[in-house]
């Protein structure tokens, strides 16, 4: 089974967590694209979706799924999204697709966060994948200096502008043993919008696509 086939298996497995008659929170990325494909098969059973990115919104609309503004709804029963890394505590690094801020907001609203991944995303210690930090453009160098004081090596992801009009610093060289503490520490730097650590709002269920099928954790 290829990596993409494992992603597809995880994406389709998430369908069983979708509650008919509700609005579904939808994340961003290659694995989520498979979930959107699956969600389209039951689009007449849901009331629509809230999306974490322009790209996912466009894909949902292509299937005729109504996309709501998060400000227009009171609650989400479920949010389905991928991860770049996840550990045994279900802490995650997300944001490889630069949608981390909107992903974190939608995840905060949802009653349940379903993380869909292939088996290459599970790690013992977070940090091999660069940690994305969304930053107000004028604060780029200041934030980079502050991150270096914490032991990280930030690199500007040149040419990338988030859906919110900000930039991304990818932080390398950090073995993240206390994800909750670092999440707060980074968010406390003036100019940081948010960072890609999802520790305070981690996953409730993890669906892992493997060569032998989907494992639920």
Curated annotation (Swiss-Prot):
- Per UniProt, which keywords does this protein have? Isomerase
A Gene Ontology term for the protein's cellular component: cytosol
Pathway recorded for this protein: Carbohydrate degradation; pentose phosphate pathway; D-ribose 5-phosphate from D-ribulose 5-phosphate (non-oxidative stage): step 1/1
Matches recorded under InterPro entries: NagB/RpiA_transferase-like, Ribose5P_isomerase_typA_subgr, Ribose5P_isomerase_type_A
**Domain of life of the organism in this record?**
Bacteria
Residue numbers binding substrate: 28-31, 81-84, 94-97, 121
A single Gene Ontology biological process assigned to it is:
pentose-phosphate shunt, non-oxidative branch
Identify the Gene3D superfamilies for this entry: 3.30.70.260, 3.40.50.1360
**What's a Pfam family in this record?**
Rib_5-P_isom_A
From the UniProt record, list the reaction(s) this protein catalyses.
Answer: aldehydo-D-ribose 5-phosphate = D-ribulose 5-phosphate
Functional description taken from the UniProt entry: Catalyzes the reversible conversion of ribose-5-phosphate to ribulose 5-phosphate.
Tell me the protein family, please. Answer: Belongs to the ribose 5-phosphate isomerase family.
Q: Provide the protein name.
A: Ribose-5-phosphate isomerase A
């Amino acid at each position: 089974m290829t990596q993409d086939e494992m992603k597809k298996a995880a994406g389709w497995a998430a369908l069983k967590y979708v509650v008919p008659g509700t609005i579904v929170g939808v994340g961003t990325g290659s694995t989520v694209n498979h979930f959107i494909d699956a969600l389209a098969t039951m689009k007449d059973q849901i009331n629509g979706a809230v999306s974490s990115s322009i790209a996912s919104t466009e894909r949902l609309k292509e299937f005729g799924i109504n996309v709501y503004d998060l400000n227009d709804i009171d609650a989400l029963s479920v949010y389905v999204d991928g991860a770049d890394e996840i550990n045994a505590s279900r802490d995650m690094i997300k944001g490889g697709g630069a949608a981390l801020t909107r992903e974190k907001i939608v995840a905060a609203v949802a009653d349940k966060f379903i993380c869909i991944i292939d088996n290459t995303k599970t790690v013992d210690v977070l940090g091999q994948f660069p940690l994305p930090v969304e930053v107000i453009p004028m604060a780029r160098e200041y934030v980079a200096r502050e991150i270096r004081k914490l032991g990280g090596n930030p690199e500007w992801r040149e040419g990338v502008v988030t859906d919110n009009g900000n930039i991304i610093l990818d932080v390398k060289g950090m073995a993240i043993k206390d994800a909750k503490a670092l999440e707060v520490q980074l968010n406390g730097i003036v100019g940081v919008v948010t960072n890609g650590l999802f520790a305070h709002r981690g996953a409730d269920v993890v669906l892992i696509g493997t060569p032998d099928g989907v494992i639920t954790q």
